[in-house]
């Protein structure tokens, strides 16, 4: 099992957007809630803090990608130090991706459950839930996989969500429900994806 090109592109886009916009987010927060008092100090402190977290994330990921086993403790420490932040969630998604590549699906499942628990962002939560369902499907955990798909709230993932639901339902022997899920997936899919889904429908 591997993540789709669309999933990887979406996660890359999320990372790029965050790196480009986190300063603006901080400014908006201060204007809305901070008032004028302490503006310069608070702005400087938060930007330095975010720069530090970003650099630490990139370094931790670089080291972990080179040798996951040797760097596991340090990578987990980074996640702990940045608990409940987007960087922790992104690190957990990266950890799961590498685990899947190494066919360590239980480790991937654990990382994705942590990502869901730590995420306060609908997009990251949806990505985490979709990937968790994929891993659980790979592990033969069909009912938990369907349950995880309920946490995919972002509409951009509706096609992928329904497609995976159809695959899981088909594995459970429920062809009628699988057919409905595939048809729903087709409604939001691109041209190529529609053709691939039609193949599934034709084989029911």
Swiss-Prot record:
The keyword Membrane applies. The chain crosses the membrane at residues 24-44. It is found in: Cell inner membrane. GO terms for cellular component: plasma membrane. The keyword Cell inner membrane applies. Keywords: Cell inner membrane, Cell membrane, Chaperone, Membrane, Transmembrane, Transmembrane helix. Interacts with the SecYEG translocon. Forms a complex with PpiD. This is Ancillary SecYEG translocon subunit. It comes from Aggregatibacter actinomycetemcomitans (Actinobacillus actinomycetemcomitans). The lineage of its organism: Bacteria, Pseudomonadati, Pseudomonadota, Gammaproteobacteria, Pasteurellales.
């Amino acid at each position: 099992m591997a993540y789709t090109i669309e999933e990887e592109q979406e996660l890359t886009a999320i990372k790029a957007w965050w790196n480009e916009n986190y300063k603006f987010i901080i400014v908006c927060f201060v204007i809305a809630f901070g008032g004028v008092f302490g503006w310069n100090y608070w702005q400087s402190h938060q930007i330095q803090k975010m720069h530090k977290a970003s650099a630490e994330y990139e370094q931790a990921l670089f080291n972990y990608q080179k040798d996951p086993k040797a760097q596991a403790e340090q990578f987990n420490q980074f996640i702990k130090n940045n608990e409940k932040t987007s960087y922790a969630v992104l690190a957990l998604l990266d950890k799961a991706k590498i685990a899947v590549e190494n066919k360590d699906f239980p480790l991937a499942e654990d990382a994705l459950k942590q990502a869901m628990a730590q995420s306060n962002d609908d997009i990251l939560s949806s990505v985490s839930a979709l990937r968790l369902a994929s891993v659980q499907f790979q592990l033969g955990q069909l009912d938990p996989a369907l349950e995880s798909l309920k946490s995919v709230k972002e509409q951009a993932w509706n096609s992928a969500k329904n497609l995976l639901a159809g695959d899981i339902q088909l594995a459970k022997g429920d062809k009628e429900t699988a057919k409905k899920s595939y048809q729903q997936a087709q409604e939001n899919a691109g041209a190529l994806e529609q053709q691939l889904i039609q193949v599934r429908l034709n084989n029911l």
